[in-house]
C-alpha cells in the first residue's frame, strides 16, 4: 500500500478538499500550500478519532475567528462513507469519527490475508551502522541500547521498502588496542605467579619500562575479563611457547601486537555471542585495520577539498570550522601517524563507494562533539548533508531498589550487556529490547531492573504479550485453528456499536499508520507506545461481559473473532518489528474470559 492510502491520510485528503472548497466560496485566492493543514489523533476520544487544529492555526492568515472558520470548513465535508460524524469543538477543532463499516473494510484490506505496510515513494539503499563497540572489552549497557535501537530501526526501514544493511565497525587499530595487549601481557605474568602492580599516577616512563617493572599502565585495562584472555593464551600451547620466547628476549613490541590481535579476536567473538543472544544480526563486521592496510586512510587528504586541508605546525589539519566545528582538527600527527578522525573519514568514504545512498550512524552519548567534524568531512568530499544522519543512543542508568547501579569500564566494576541478559533470565531478550525501546533514544533512560524482572502484567512487555496469548487461548478454547479459520466475507458494522468494540477496531485500523510514522521518524518508542495502547484497548474489550465470545453465536461470534484475530496480527507484527517474540501461551492467559 502507498502512504496516501493510510487511514489518517484519507481523512487529510478530505480535509484538504473541504478547505479548498471553503477558500473558493470565501473568494480567498491563496494556494493550499500557504496554509497549515494537518490531522492529529483526538486528545479526548469522546470527540472523535481524529481532529484538526486548522481553524486555530490559520486564523491570522484568514482574519476570521476559529469557530467561523471551522464551521465553514465543516459544511464542505460530504463523505458519508468515510465519516460517522464531523463536529466542531471549542476553541477551534474539527473532529472526525470514522464510520465502523469503513473501519472494518479498511482493516480487512490491510490486515488480510497478511499484514501489509505502507511503502515510501523514495526508496534508498541504506547502510545502518550501530553498536560498533570497541573490541577492548565486553559490550556495556549503552551498547545494548544501541543494539536494540539499531536492529528495530533496520526492521522499520525495511518495512518502508528501503534496502538496508546492518554494519558493525570494528575499531581494531590504534593505541587503545595496543594498550589492550599490554594489559593481557601483565595478566599473563600474574597468572604465572608473578606479582604485578597498578600505576595510579602517570609518569614519563615508557610502556616497555613499566612492563619490565611489572606495572600495568594507568591508561590500560584492568577488568577481570583480561584475566580470562590471559588464561586462554596460556592454555594454547603453541601461543604460550611463542609468548614465552618473546618475554625471554624482551621483544615487547612484537609480543604486544600479537596479544592485541588475539585479545581483539577473543573480545569480538564474545561480543558476537552476546548480540546473538539479544537477537541482533549484522550483515558485516567491518575492520578498521583493513582500511589502514589498503592505504585508504593515507588517501584521505586527496578526498577532501584542497582548501579544506592545511598543514599547521607540522600537523595536517582538516579545516572543520568551515563546517560548523568549534576548531580545526588534526588528521595526521607530526610523526606521520593518522588520527582516529582520519580513519573515520576513510571509513565513511568507503561506505559511499560501496553504493549506499544514505548513511545512518548510531553513536553513544559521549560522541556529540564528534558530529560536526565528520559531517563536515562528508560535505567536503562532495556528499549531501541529507545523505548522512547521525543518531545518538543516550546514557542508560540501571536502577535497582530505586537507586542507580554504578558502572566503570576500566576498573572492571561495570555491568555488561551479558550481565544484564543473565540477570533478566529466560526473558532477557524480549524484556531487554522492549525496555531499551520504551523511551526516545536521544533521552537518558532509567532501566528499572526490578520492573524488568517482574513477570506479571505490571511489566509492560508482558502486558502486551499476555494480550496476544489471550487471543490465542480464545481460539484454542473454541477449538478453532487460527491458520485455517476463514475470515467472514461480509462483516457488518452492526456488531461494533459498543464503546469497547469500536475503540479496539479503531486501534487495530491505526496499525499501518503507526508503523509508518514510527519508521519515517526513526523513533521505535512510538511503536512501543502504540502496542501498549492497543493491548489496553483489547484488555478493556476482553474484560467486558458482553464480549464473551464463547457465549456468542453465528454472525456476532464470527465478527468478534474477526476483530480479535486482527488485533493479534497487529500485536505480533509490531513486536516482530521490535525484535520481540509474541508467545501463543503464557501462564496468565489461562485466566480466560472467553
Swiss-Prot record:
The keyword Protein biosynthesis applies. A motif ('HIGH' region) lies at residues 133-143. The keyword Lipoprotein does not apply. Its EC number is 6.1.1.19. GO terms for molecular function: arginine-tRNA ligase activity; ATP binding. GO terms for cellular component: cytoplasm. It is found in: Cytoplasm. It catalyses: tRNA(Arg) + L-arginine + ATP = L-arginyl-tRNA(Arg) + AMP + diphosphate. InterPro entries: Arg-tRNA-ligase, Arg-tRNA-synth_N, Arg-tRNA-synth_N_sf, ArgRS_core, DALR_anticod-bd, Rossmann-like_a/b/a_fold, tRNAsynth_Ia_anticodon-bd. Keywords: Aminoacyl-tRNA synthetase, ATP-binding, Cytoplasm, Ligase, Nucleotide-binding, Protein biosynthesis. GO terms for biological process: arginyl-tRNA aminoacylation. It holds the Pfam family Arg_tRNA_synt_N. PANTHER family: ARGININE--TRNA LIGASE, CYTOPLASMIC (PTHR11956:SF5), ARGINYL-TRNA SYNTHETASE (PTHR11956). Monomer. Belongs to the class-I aminoacyl-tRNA synthetase family. This is Arginine--tRNA ligase. The lineage of its organism: Bacteria, Pseudomonadati, Spirochaetota, Spirochaetia, Leptospirales.
Amino acid at each position: 500500500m502507498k502512504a496516501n492510502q493510510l487511514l489518517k491520510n484519507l481523512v487529510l485528503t478530505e480535509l484538504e478538499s473541504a478547505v479548498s472548497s471553503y477558500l473558493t466560496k470565501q473568494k480567498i485566492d491563496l494556494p493550499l500550500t500557504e496554509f497549515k493543514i494537518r490531522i492529529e489523533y483526538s486528545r479526548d476520544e469522546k470527540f472523535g478519532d481524529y481532529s484538526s487544529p486548522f481553524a486555530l492555526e490559520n486564523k491570522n492568515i484568514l482574519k476570521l475567528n476559529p469557530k467561523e472558520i471551522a464551521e465553514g470548513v465543516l459544511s464542505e465535508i460530504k463523505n458519508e462513507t468515510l465519516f460517522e460524524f464531523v463536529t466542531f469543538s471549542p476553541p477551534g477543532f474539527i473532529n472526525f469519527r470514522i464510520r465502523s463499516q469503513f473501519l472494518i473494510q479498511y482493516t480487512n484490506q490491510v490486515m488480510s490475508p497478511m499484514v501489509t505496510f505502507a511503502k515510501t515513494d523514495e526508496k534508498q539503499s541504506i547502510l545502518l551502522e550501530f553498536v560498533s563497540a570497541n573490541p577492548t572489552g565486553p559490550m556495556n549497557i549503552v551498547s545494548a541500547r544501541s543494539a536494540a535501537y539499531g536492529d528495530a530501526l533496520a526492521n522499520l526501514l525495511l518495512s518502508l521498502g528501503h534496502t538496508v544493511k546492518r554494519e558493525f565497525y570494528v575499531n581494531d587499530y590504534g593505541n587503545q588496542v595496543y594498550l589492550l595487549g599490554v594489559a593481557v601481557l601483565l595478566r599473563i605474568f600474574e597468572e604465572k605467579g608473578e606479582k604485578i602492580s597498578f600505576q595510579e599516577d602517570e609518569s614519563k616512563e615508557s610502556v616497555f619500562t613499566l612492563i619490565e617493572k611489572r606495572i600495568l599502565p594507568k591508561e590500560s585495562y584492568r577488568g577481570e575479563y583480561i584475566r580470562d584472555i590471559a588464561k586462554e593464551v596460556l592454555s594454547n600451547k603453541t601461543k604460550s611457547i611463542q609468548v614465552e620466547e618473546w618475554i625471554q628476549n624482551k621483544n615487547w613490541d612484537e609480543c604486544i601486537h600479537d596479544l592485541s590481535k588475539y585479545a581483539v579476536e577473543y573480545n569480538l567473538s564474545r561480543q558476537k555471542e552476546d548480540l546473538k543472544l539479544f537477537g541482533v544480526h549484522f550483515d558485516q563486521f567491518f575492520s578498521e585495520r583493513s582500511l589502514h592496510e589498503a592505504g585508504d586512510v593515507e588517501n584521505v587528504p586527496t578526498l577532501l577539498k584542497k582548501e579544506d586541508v592545511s598543514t599547521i605546525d607540522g600537523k595536517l589539519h582538516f579545516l572543520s570550522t568551515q563546517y560548523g566545528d568549534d576548531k580545526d582538527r588534526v588528521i595526521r600527527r607530526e610523526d606521520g601517524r593518522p588520527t582516529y578522525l582520519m580513519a573515520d573519514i576513510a571509513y565513511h568514504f568507503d561506505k559511499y563507494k560501496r553504493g549506499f545512498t544514505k548513511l545512518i550512524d548510531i553513536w553513544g552519548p559521549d560522541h556529540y562533539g564528534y558530529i560536526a567534524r565528520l559531517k563536515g568531512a562528508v560535505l567536503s568530499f562532495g556528499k549531501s548533508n541529507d545523505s548522512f544522519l547521525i543518531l545518538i543512543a543516550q546514557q542508560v542508568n540501571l536502577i535497582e531498589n530505586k537507586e542507580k547501579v554504578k558502572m566503570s569500564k576500566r576498573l572492571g566494576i561495570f555491568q555488561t550487556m551479558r550481565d544484564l541478559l543473565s540477570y533478566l533470565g529466560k526473558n532477557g531478550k524480549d524484556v531487554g529490547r522492549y525496555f531499551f525501546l520504551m523511551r526516545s533514544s536521544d533521552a537518558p533512560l532509567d532501566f528499572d531492573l526490578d520492573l524488568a524482572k517482574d513477570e506479571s502484567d505490571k511489566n509492560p512487555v508482558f502486558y502486551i504479550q499476555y494480550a496476544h496469548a489471550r487471543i490465542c487461548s480464545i481460539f484454542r478454547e473454541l477449538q478453532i485453528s487460527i491458520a485455517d479459520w476463514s475470515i467472514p466475507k461480509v462483516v457488518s458494522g452492526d456488531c461494533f456499536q459498543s464503546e469497547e468494540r469500536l475503540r479496539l477496531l479503531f486501534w487495530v485500523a491505526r496499525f499501518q499508520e503507526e508503523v509508518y510514522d514510527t519508521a519515517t521518524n526513526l523513533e521505535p518508542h512510538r511503536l512501543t507506545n502504540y502496542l501498549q495502547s492497543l493491548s489496553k484497548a483489547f484488555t478493556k474489550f476482553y474484560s467486558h461481559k458482553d464480549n464473551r465470545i464463547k457465549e456468542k453465536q453465528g454472525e456476532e461470534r464470527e465478527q468478534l473473532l474477526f476483530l480479535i484475530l486482527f488485533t493479534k496480527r497487529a500485536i505480533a507484527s509490531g513486536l516482530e518489528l521490535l525484535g520481540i517474540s509474541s508467545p501463543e501461551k503464557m501462564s496468565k492467559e489461562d485466566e480466560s474470559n472467553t
